[in-house]
């Protein structure tokens, strides 16, 4: 997902837990699966293959978890009146915020308009009726970017694994997305620090 992650959990002795190394191995495996499915920073991931290697009107088979996240993205697009749109990838990349090379100069109005023509939740179809879900573009150049919710999905995956082990005190963070339960080592609620943004004169936000 092109970001960092941190996991803390407390072994309170109430249940027999696997060794820390085994827990780490399982957590890494779960994250790898999410990356293999939904990371635009990984060239061979499912989402990268869909973005770069499929033509318009060509169904592309995806995993159930990938489909679940896309389905949620479609729902969120509706309830936010389009504020959350996972098809903004072409614009994200144009401005240098995606896995593509960084921005060297401000894009022209023509470039922005061209990329914007590829954006829209109505420009792809998710079909979950078959044995395996499929995604189909209606326009060549459509680029899905699930970074707005895929990290949260990954956080939930890791938290669910910890709870399956019987761990009731944990804090999971992936790229700023958090899920916590219980208390820290001092038996106090987890405290989350939020960095105050600063802006140097002459910089743009």
Question: How would you describe each model-predicted region?
Answer:
Residues 1-205:
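Mature catalytic core of soluble alpha/beta enzymes
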């Amino acid at each position: 997902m092109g970001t960092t992650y941190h996991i803390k959990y407390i072994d309170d002795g109430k249940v027999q837990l696997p060794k820390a190394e085994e827990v780490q191995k399982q957590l890494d495996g779960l994250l790898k699966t999410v990356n293999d499915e939904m990371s635009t920073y990984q060239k061979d991931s499912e989402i990268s293959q869909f973005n770069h290697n499929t033509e318009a009107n060509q169904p592309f088979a995806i995993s159930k978890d990938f489909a679940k996240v896309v389905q949620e993205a479609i729902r969120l697009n509706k309830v936010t009146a389009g504020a959350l749109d996972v098809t903004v990838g072409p614009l994200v990349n144009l401005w240098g915020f995606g896995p593509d090379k960084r921005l060297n100069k401000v894009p022209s109005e023509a470039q922005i308009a061209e990329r914007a023509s590829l954006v829209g939740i109505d420009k792809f179809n998710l079909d979950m009726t078959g044995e395996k879900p499929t995604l189909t573009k209606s326009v060549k150049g459509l680029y899905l970017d699930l970074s707005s919710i895929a990290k949260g999905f990954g956080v939930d995956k890791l938290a669910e694994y910890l709870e399956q082990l019987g761990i009731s005190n944990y804090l999971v963070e992936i790229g700023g997305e958090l899920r916590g339960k219980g208390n820290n080592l001092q038996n106090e609620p987890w405290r989350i620090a939020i960095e105050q943004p600063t802006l140097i004169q002459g910089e743009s936000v």
